[in-house]
Amino acid sequence: MHKIISLIVLVILLNGCGGGGGSSPSQLTPIPAQENNSSETLDPNTDIFIPKETFETPEYRNQWGLDFINASDAYSYGASGKGVVVGVVDEALDWGHHEFLKENILHPDSVLTYSGNREPTPLEKFHGTATSSIIAGRKDNEPVDRNMHGVAYDAQILFIAIELGSPPSDGEYEPIDIPAFSWERFDEQESKFYEELSSKSDVINNSFGFTGQITDYSRETLQNTFPKLINTFASQQETIFVWSAGNYNGITDTEGEQVNAANPGILAGLGYYFPELAKNNVAVVAVDQEGEIADFSNRCGVAADFCIAAPGVRVPLAIPNNLFNSLSENEKSNFNDNVLDYLENHPTEAYLLGSGTSFSAPHVTGSIAVLKELFRDNLSSVQILERLFVTANKTGKYADKEIYGQGLLDLKKASSPVGSTLFYTRSSIYSEALPSKSSNIFLTKSFGDGLKNSLGKTKLSIFDALGAPFSVPVSSFVRSNISSSKTMERLFNFKEKKYGYISSQGFEFYSSWKRFLNSTGAEVNKIDFAEINFRRKDTLLSFAYGKNPSSNFLDTSEELLIHQSFYDKEAFLNPWLNLVEEGYSLGFSNRLNALYFDLNIFSGFKRSEDWFLKPNYYFQKTKNESKGFNLSLRNNILSKFMIGYTLGFLETNNGLFHNRFNGAFNIIEDTKSIFSSISFKSSLVKELNFIGSINYSNSSNINSDKIIKNISGLEEFSFDFALIKKSLFYKNDFLSFRIKQDPRIEKARVSLNIPKGRNPNGVVEFQSLTLPITPSGREINFETSWSFHRDNSKSFINLSFIDDKDHIKTKDIEINLIFAHQRFF
């Protein structure tokens, strides 16, 4: 296999940043045994793929840093670093450790030995094993003592072993004297090394550094010393370089003074002098379990703009297998007595606790790998790092940029939408945006579940305030716009008062009033409809408010018969003309030999469910205004068998009937529909009537320039039949049997242009879909009613059976019973 070989000169000057400043585990402590007796109840979130609690296993909780950065929230979105290559430049790796026993976890170009093919000692494998386990230790849920997993547990590690020197102890700290050495070879080779490593890695973890702070040197010194390396870091914009800030705060220098490490180390802080590096380089400081900056950790200081805080104190991590048995007496001196005693008593121990910015940096590296998978091909590395900074916790103490820089790492916020989510219906995220909150589709009963079923699990992208895409089901924006007050409407109809007056000059006046409680709780009379007719021989001219225009097809006596039998204003009328109920209609009727000709012109709005709270004749205009006309031809309305045919035209502004398409789903084109009805009434025997209607509509293609591009071939159908027997038990009682189907889409297609993410340049990508719309069920409503009318009282009983309610297939039959009685005093 091809290997990348790091030829680092002056290796003794590069020190690991774990264990208090070096690769030795002097700040490592044994892990005390813990029991997890918690039993949490899952609280599924429908906006994510899997409830986050699913990921909060004992393995997850054994590494407190995971919960501290809210890693499970990112996992719930389906991101775990899969497909992401993480470069790890570190001392050495125990690749046989339990945390790395996973197929393909190691990139084939990994280099696990030193120059000359020397095998690192178990102690030399300590630091790299620890950092790698935090980044990408495998998730296996096996009952291994102290088992844990990494932040990006599905990422692949490209490990490069380098030899690191030991960090200075108290009294030995001294910033490296850069002018005292020749750096040309180092600069040349490290530049090539990182250039090649960057070509194969999405993010590179560097838990090491020189002694000294970035502010100990001038820009000119660093520019002259590392020109090629700096240029490489700047040119590799698609790779993020993560650096440990250093562990030198509070250490004693050679002058006996305590070091105030107010700024990160040289490599971690290069972005201060070279701003172009701040876009893809990040320095990481360490915090403890309380979220406080670690005493030993360098601060962000001058690197605040590209510095972040992450867990780095007593972090659970993996160590080489059987470490104690491999240690020489000299190597044992690197451990404090507590750790050494623990390892001696647990010689096979494979986990310890470690402190250092070496272990905070891998939390950031792993988080970037998770975000890289989540936003792969959508956001560039620079954009991901910017997102990590913007979403970091900046509240309270984390607002102190001198210490915490951009704040505390928060993977939940980084993987979740920032601010209000938006839709882009054009080709760029820099074009006009539409809020997703106000983008929705409200469908009437005729659609049933047809659109939702066709959409299935189809997803689209919404974008947050930072331009990041999030995939959500299209169906989540589809809602029902079905009246919930049918029963209450019948009760109101039962209580309504009708008035009529016929003058000798041919004028007829009719009105209906309903009594409601208004918004203040007071009872008010609200006009339901009003009608003025002028009748002259075979000619009728009518003007009405609040009525379905197709009701002109009925004689006054027939209207009364239907009203008293069902208390349903929509019975046997054209269902689409309810769209102009809150409006006016003008009708003309004339006899043509043996036939009658009717013409109606109408305009109005669909009456809202709270219409009775508005003042009389108050129109709450919406964008869905409808207007049109219809022509009817029928035989004598008073004959024993009446049949008629109606043909009409209906135009609805900015929408489709009473369906509402808002925001990114907006339809701005008017809907033009042709509707037809066959209506009939037959007097079978005395006081026994058979009445019914069959209705059909066909709508023109509707086009839009947003997500819904076209709705075509829309056909709807409905029917309503009833048998009514008058004076069965009493003179003024009515027994009826009725079967009906409300309008249902029989055929339609919808064409969509769905946003499916973006590229790093902000170009929104779309997917075109054309789907049929067919409800899964067909609602059939069978009902029987009995009503009785006296001078001082009236009663009404209605029993209904509804199969496939709302045109949605179901095994259940809904049964409703209405009983109403009113007495007049």
Task: For the regions a language model picked out, list residue spans one by one.
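Residues on the lipid-exposed face of transmembrane beta-strands in outer-membrane beta-barrel proteins
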Residues: 530-534, 586-590, 631-635, 676-682, ...
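Outer-membrane beta-barrel channels and translocator barrels
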Residues: 536-539, 592-595, 636-640, 683-687, ...
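Outer membrane beta-barrel transmembrane domains
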Residues: 554-556, 561-578, 598, 614-623, ...
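Substrate-binding/access-modulating region of protease and related hydrolase catalytic domains
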Residues: 22-26, 80-81, 138, 142, ...
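Extracellular S/T/G-rich loop segment that most often corresponds to the catalytic His/Ser-adjacent loop
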Residues: 90, 270-369
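C-terminal subdomain of the subtilisin-like protease fold in secreted/lumenal serine endopeptidases
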Residues: 63, 70, 201-205, 373-489
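Subtilisin-like serine protease catalytic core
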Residues: 40-53, 62, 72-108, 115-183, ...
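C-terminal motif of bacterial Sec signal peptides marking the signal peptidase cleavage site
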Residues: 13-16
